[in-house]
Each structure stands twice: as structure tokens, then as C-alpha cells.
């Protein structure tokens, strides 16, 4: 495929976001020249990292309105760059920020936008498979437009290096102050430690856990495995755990090496958040529960007996 793919990069404190490394891998798969745009502060030192992942040109957008995330202003910058360099494809990872910025840019360019694609096949038009209805189905579609604006589903494309020479171009954006409708008024540091989105192991609990106190054995197992505790929406709705622990369409989408789902029925909105897990183990008394039928492995039994037994066996083997 000829032409250029422009990748919208997410970064934080001088480091590329893992999501953007996934987007760069997807862009290289199209067979085009890959260029990237960074918007906001702390992007000056990213060219070497971008070069390591196959980027030929790094466009750095500068403006006082871009120091913090403002979707309207960021979308205007991307739209202006598209008008200037005429890429064939504009691509980002389908995070909240990636989808929001591409939607803003597409609206300004009067072009269609296809979000959360799991497969891209270029030709005279762009054939794609994408997640629909919160991930409950996969849709095959074709995008015909002068510029293809797409995001790729998070956690589905494996980052990999492809070193190349990268030049840097500064983009002096001209922005209307009216675009500054959003501004950051404070930043709150997350407590140090493994996060739900990055943990190698997640032990999730649902309504079947029974109470806030019922999560203690799950926390013990998670600690033994070097992981964290997650939960279903039913748990947060009951006030048993914080929304920050929720796995699902309206919570966090996870992709651990192992997800242990305890007492979780497997409603579609939860499955959307967990389906990228490499291995899923369900523990449930109901052999017909959705999570049990979709899991790679299942234990049919009372989680209050099964979880402590697993934890004890892990400790016994480590001690021997």
C-alpha cells in the first residue's frame, strides 16, 4: 500500500504510552510510510523512541493551549496536520483519549471515523473488522474516503520494534482560544504499585463473593501471585469496592496473563473488559454461567472454599 499513515501518539512525562506502541505496530502492518504526531508538553525527547518503532517523521505540535489535554484543541491540531501532509490513513489506539481526539479531527475534516478495529486490510477501500455494541459482536465493514481515520482496539496489537531514521518537524499550531473548553485543574498521583490495567494477574470477584469482607481471600491469592484484585459492576453498584477496581466496558479493560473470575456470571459488559486476557479461569457454582462457558479453564465449586485452598497450596509448594 502506498502513502503515509499518521499515528496520533499518547505520551506521559516523556515516555510513549503502551497504547501508542500498539498503534504503531498496527500502522506498520498496513505497509505504508509511518509518521507520528505528538501534542502537548514533554514530547521533545520522544523522537528516538518513535524511530525505534518505525516512525520516519515526528511532528511536534507546540502551543500554550496544548500543554494539557484539551480534546477540541488536540483535534484541531490533528485536522490541520492532515490538511498539510495529506496522509492516506490517520490512526490511534482506541483508548478514551485516542477515540476522542480522532472523533474531533474527523468532524473538522468532514470525514468518517471507524473506532476500535481489530483487523485492517487496505485496498481500494479499507476493509476492517471492528468491535460493536460494546464488544458483544464483531462487524466486518468497508471504509471509503479520501483519508481513512481509524482507531485500533486496545490490547490486540503486539508492540514491536522496527528501527528506522526519524526526522523531527515542529508544528506551530494556530488555535482559537475558544477551543480551550477543557482544562486540567489538578493532578492526583496514583498510589505506587501494580495497576489493574498493567497487572500480570487479576483476581476478580463478582456478586457471588457475597460481601466486602468476602474479598479478603481474593486479595490473599492476588498477593501470592503478584497481581491485583478486580471486580464486576455489580460489586461497585453494591458499594463493596471502588469503581477503580471495576473490570468491564464501563470500567477498565484488562489484558493480564491470567484472569481468575470468582463468582462472576459473565455479563457482556464485563466480558468486554476481560476478553483480552491471555488465560481465563472461572470459579463458580453454576456450570452454565457465561464466564464459565467462555473461560479456558473452570472450577465448579464454592469460591469461599476453592480460593483459600488454592492459596494454601501455592504457599505449601513455595515452602517445600
Feature roles, as predicted:
Residues 1-320:
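N-terminal glycine-rich FAD/FM-binding segment characteristic of electron-transfer flavoproteins
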Amino acid at each position: 500500500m502506498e502513502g503515509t499513515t499518521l499515528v496520533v501518539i499518547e505520551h506521559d512525562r516523556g515516555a510513549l504510552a503502551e497504547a501508542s506502541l500498539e498503534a504503531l505496530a498496527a500502522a506498520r502492518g498496513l505497509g505504508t510510510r509511518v509518521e507520528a504526531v505528538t501534542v502537548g508538553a514533554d514530547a521533545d525527547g520522544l523522537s528516538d523512541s518513535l524511530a525505534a518503532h518505525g516512525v520516519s517523521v515526528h511532528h511536534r505540535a507546540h502551543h500554550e493551549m496544548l500543554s494539557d489535554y484539551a480534546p477540541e484543541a488536540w483535534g484541531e491540531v490533528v485536522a490541520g496536520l492532515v490538511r498539510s501532509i495529506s496522509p492516506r490513513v490517520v490512526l490511534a489506539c482506541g483508548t478514551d483519549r485516542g477515540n476522542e481526539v480522532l472523533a474531533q479531527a474527523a468532524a473538522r475534516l468532514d470525514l468518517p471515523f471507524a473506532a476500535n478495529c481489530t483487523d485492517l486490510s487496505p485496498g481500494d477501500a479499507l476493509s476492517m473488522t471492528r468491535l460493536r455494541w460494546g464488544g458483544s459482536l464483531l462487524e466486518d465493514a468497508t471504509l471509503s474516503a479520501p483519508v481513512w481515520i481509524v482507531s485500533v482496539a486496545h490490547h490486540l496489537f503486539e508492540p514491536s520494534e522496527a528501527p528506522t531514521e526519524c526526522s523531527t518537524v515542529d508544528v506551530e499550531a494556530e488555535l482559537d482560544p475558544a477551543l480551550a473548553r477543557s482544562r486540567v485543574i489538578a493532578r492526583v498521583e496514583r498510589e505506587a504499585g501494580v495497576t489493574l490495567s498493567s497487572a500480570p494477574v487479576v483476581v476478580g470477584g463478582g456478586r457471588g463473593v457475597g460481601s466486602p469482607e468476602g474479598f479478603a481471600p481474593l486479595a490473599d491469592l492476588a498477593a501470592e501471585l503478584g497481581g491485583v484484585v478486580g471486580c464486576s459492576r455489580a460489586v461497585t453498584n453494591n458499594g463493596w469496592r471502588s469503581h477503580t477496581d471495576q473490570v468491564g466496558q464501563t470500567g477498565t479493560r484488562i489484558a493480564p496473563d491470567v484472569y481468575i473470575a470468582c463468582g462472576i456470571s459473565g455479563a457482556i459488559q464485563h466480558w468486554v473488559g476481560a476478553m483480552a486476557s491471555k488465560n481465563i479461569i472461572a470459579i463458580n457454582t453454576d456450570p452454565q454461567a457465561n464466564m464459565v462457558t467462555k473461560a479456558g479453564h473452570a472450577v465448579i465449586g464454592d469460591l469461599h472454599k476453592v480460593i483459600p485452598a488454592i492459596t494454601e497450596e501455592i504457599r505449601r509448594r513455595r515452602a517445600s
